A protein has these predicted regions:
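NAD(P)H-binding glycine-rich loop region in Rossmannoid oxidoreductase-like domains
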Residues: 57-96
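Conserved Rossmann-fold NAD(P)-dependent oxidoreductase catalytic core, especially the SDR/UDP-sugar
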Residues: 102-144
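N-terminal Rossmann/SDR dinucleotide-binding element
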Residues: 1-73
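SDR active-site strand-loop-helix element
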Residues: 6, 32, 74-77, 116-122, ...
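Conserved catalytic-core motifs of eukaryotic protein kinase domains, centered on the activation segment
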Residues: 41-42, 84-91, 127-131, 179-180
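Active-site helix of classical SDR
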Residues: 148
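C-terminal substrate-binding subdomain of Rossmann-fold SDR/epimerase-dehydratase oxidoreductases
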Residues: 198, 203-360
Length: 360
């Protein structure tokens, strides 16, 4: 089996590469990535690309068609990947997350790819009062990031897919340790605050709901999806990926971290205005379709892995929100240094100064 992983040098892609190699040891794995975060390694001995057969550098908006030749499955992770980045680069978010994703899906279908897996998001539900959101419930995307995800999902259903099966995994909020760690995720941020500062400050009143999924379980869901048959949910499926027990209020997350990191204080702004982004999610369809891929990593285990990982790194950066572990800060540094344009394309000068060279 030949698998193309777009965005393989990111937070999820680094874990997915390892997971795919473990599950399909004889497969041919090809990575495609712009390289924006290639240097953001958790440790110098953790280079996931060594598990690939080939690494290709490029812009997902200009992916070469021939790269899809002979590919059996595509795991499409490339994206401007959270709300702050979507707000800062709103137009680019639409271009990369939606326009390029839809174009890639059509290209994959035209080239005979059997399975196309799209990393979508539960953030499309936005503000959801009442019970947990099911796939059939209305979506209220409140951000450019969320709009790009639901826009892509809808467009996939209008494509000429031929024999290709499409799976849009509406992931819960990611958390957990990775070879390319991100600290701009709610649980990861809380653990970093506890380790470096001994205090977690919750800027909201702590009431908003968030579903969580460990990055290891995200990878396991993708492994299931790249082998999914159309009779298992339909030719073009959108499914919430997570577990019902993974729905938490933000204050519960902070309190869980404080229990595991001794001496951590939790400060909650109970006078803060309500956070519009609040939603509980129903994961019963995923449990039915993919019982072997139901998330296994508990909240406490995610916290422990993060705490152990950060401690092993000697992490003590109280100013980590300005570090490479915050993806928006990394992009902004590239732009200020003249390596990236405002529309997130490598500038010619970067080719000789920093930009990674293409590898065959």
């Amino acid at each position: 089996m030949r698998v193309l992983i777009t965005g393989n040098m990111g937070y999820v892609g680094s874990v997915l590469t390892r997971c795919l190699r473990a599950n399909f040891p004889a497969s041919e794995l090809i990575g495609f990535d712009a390289g924006f975060f290639g240097h953001c390694l958790t440790g110098p001995d953790l280079l996931p690309e060594t598990l690939l057969d080939r690494q290709v550098f490029g812009d997902i908006r200009d992916i070469p068609a021939e790269l899809l030749n002979g590919v059996d499955a595509v795991a499409h992770l490339s994206a401007v990947s959270n709300d702050p980045m979507g707000a800062r680069f709103e137009a680019v978010t639409g271009e990369v997350n939606q326009k390029a994703s839809v174009a890639l899906a059509q290209l994959a279908a035209d080239r005979g790819v059997k399975n196309f897996v799209f990393a979508s998001s539960c953030s499309i539900y936005g503000f959801a009062e009442g019970g947990p959101r099911k796939e059939s419930d209305p979506t209220i995307p409140l951000t450019a990031y969320a709009r790009s995800k639901i826009g892509s999902e809808k467009a996939f259903g209008e494509l000429e897919l031929d024999a290709m099966t499409v799976t849009s995994l509406r992931f819960a909020t990611a958390c957990g340790m990775s070879e390319r760690l991100r600290l701009d995720l709610v649980l990861n941020d809380f653990v970093a605050c506890a380790i470096a500062c001994g205090e977690i400050t919750v800027l909201s009143d702590g009431a908003p709901w968030r579903p969580l999924i460990d990055v290891e379980d995200m990878a396991r869901a993708i492994v299931w999806a790249i082998a999914r048959k159309p009779e298992e949910g339909g030719k073009c499926l959108a499914v919430n990926a997570g577990r019902d027990e993974g729905n938490y209020q933000v204050r519960e997350l902070a309190e869980a971290v404080a229990r595991q990191v001794p001496g951590t204080r939790v400060s909650i702004n109970r006078n803060a205005p309500p956070d519009k982004r609040s939603y509980k999610v129903d994961f019963s369809l995923f449990r039915k379709l993919a019982p072997a891929a139901v998330p296994q990593v508990s909240l406490d285990e995610s916290i422990k892995r993060l705490s152990d990982g950060l401690t092993a790194m000697g992490f003590a950066d109280r100013d980590f929100r300005n570090s490479p572990y915050m993806r928006l800060k990394t992009l902004e540094r590239h732009i200020v240094a003249g390596r990236l344009s405002a529309d997130l394309r490598w500038l010619p000068a970067a080719a000789t100064s920093w930009r990674p060279a293409a590898a065959a």
